[in-house]
Swiss-Prot record:
Native source organism of the sequence: Drosophila pseudoobscura pseudoobscura (Fruit fly)
GN (gene name): Adh
GO molecular function: alcohol dehydrogenase (NAD+) activity
Organism taxonomic ancestry: Eukaryota, Metazoa, Ecdysozoa, Arthropoda, Hexapoda
Substrates-to-products reaction catalysed: a primary alcohol + NAD(+) = an aldehyde + NADH + H(+); a secondary alcohol + NAD(+) = a ketone + NADH + H(+)
Binding site for substrate: S138
Pfam family, one: adh_short
CDD domains: ADH_SDR_c_like
The name this protein goes by in its record: Alcohol dehydrogenase
Effect of V68I: In strain: PS230
Transmembrane annotation, as ranges: none
Family the UniProt entry places it in: Belongs to the short-chain dehydrogenases/reductases (SDR) family.
Length: 254
């Protein structure tokens, strides 16, 4: 899929991986890049505009933990501005197993709520045009870092939720896939802690192993968006992009 003249809404598009991905996106000659983030970063917005002045870049403050009704209200404003949204990227995430409720609220519940809100506009059963959802998971979603089970569990939930969305595409008209970064050098990794402090040096230990830069991750992130494969589970690790084959151990029969 060519991203030329597409309208993209990027939740958490100013974070570590998020900002590098936004830089790559504007190089693709989007029509609009709408960034929703908790904290404004005027310098980053100015930089993105300078990379490609032809792309209209808009920022709205957004906390993914707000109720669905508030998200729907914000999306209504965005749709009024850009008319159509082609791609939604759900990228909000924290890695803090000391904050159990907030980790789940940001990493999973917020993603589900944002998705639920945009379906109000996209769902073909309501006359919507459909759309594409790219959810940011993590390699911990299919193989946990056991010292951070809350974070890992929240990312496993993202993978399963997104796989369900993909299978619902014939009903809703909305396709979906996950991009799942491996250990990437960002402030998120440097600051994170373990559940109940079972491993006080968990961040330090992880960084002793091979990692990738956020730029490497961002380049493959955008490649995955361009490939636009419904139901894909992409692994973005050590500068590579690889599809993961999910093994089915049970079938609901419905």
């Amino acid at each position: 899929m060519s991203l030329t003249n597409k309208n993209v809404v990027f939740v958490a598009g100013l974070g570590g991986i998020g900002l590098d991905t936004s830089r790559e996106l504007v190089k693709r000659n989007l029509k609009n890049l709408v960034i929703l983030d908790r904290i404004d970063n005027p310098a980053a917005i100015a930089e993105l505009k300078a990379i490609n002045p032809k792309v209209t870049i808009t920022f709205y403050p957004y906390d993914v933990t707000v109720p669905v009704a508030e998200t729907t209200k914000l999306l209504k404003t965005i749709f009024a501005q850009v008319k159509t949204i082609d791609v939604l990227i759900n990228g909000a995430g924290i890695l803090d197993d000391h904050q159990i409720e907030r980790t789940i609220a940001v990493n999973y519940t917020g993603l589900v709520n944002t998705t639920t809100a945009i379906l109000d506009f996209w769902d073909k059963r309501k006359g919507g045009p459909g759309g594409i959802i790219c959810n940011i998971g993590s390699v911990t979603g299919f193989n946990a870092i056991y010292q951070v089970p809350v974070y890992s569990g929240s990312k496993a939930a993202v993978v399963n939720f997104t796989s369900s969305l993909a299978k619902l595409a014939p009903i809703t008209g909305v396709t979906a896939y996950t991009v799942n970064p491996g250990i990437t050098k960002t402030t998120l990794v440097h600051k994170f802690n373990s559940w109940l402090d079972v491993e006080p040096r968990v961040a330090e230990k992880l960084l002793e192993h091979p990692t990738q830069t956020s730029q490497q991750c961002a380049e493959n992130f955008v490649k995955a968006i361009e490939l636009n494969k419904n139901g894909a589970i992409w692994k973005l690790d050590l500068g590579t992009l690889e599809p993961i084959t999910w093994t089915q151990h049970w079938d609901s029969g419905i």
